[in-house]
Amino acid sequence: MGCGNSTAASAGAGQGPAGAAKDVTEESITEDDKRRNYGGVYVGLPSEAVNMVSNQTKTVQKN
């Protein structure tokens, strides 16, 4: 459900027989995916971090 990175990781473990199990695995991972780090981009940001990012972008836009 969602990111191609999560499906690629589970498909790499077992492409053939894991086809049916992959759907079940994805459903159980969805909550975990929200907290995972994809190549430096954190998916489940807390509100404090969102405020920090928005403040940084405002500063950059002023320059």
From Swiss-Prot:
Q: Which stretches are annotated as coiled coil? A: none
By sequence similarity, the record places it as follows: Belongs to the OCC1 family.
Where on the tree of life does the source sit, at the highest rank? Eukaryota
UniProt lists compositionally biased (Low complexity) regions at 1-12
Stretches the record annotates as Disordered: 1-40
* GN (gene name): OCC1
Q: Which InterPro entries match?
A: OCC1
**Native species of this protein?**
Bos taurus
Descriptive protein name? Overexpressed in colon carcinoma 1 protein homolog
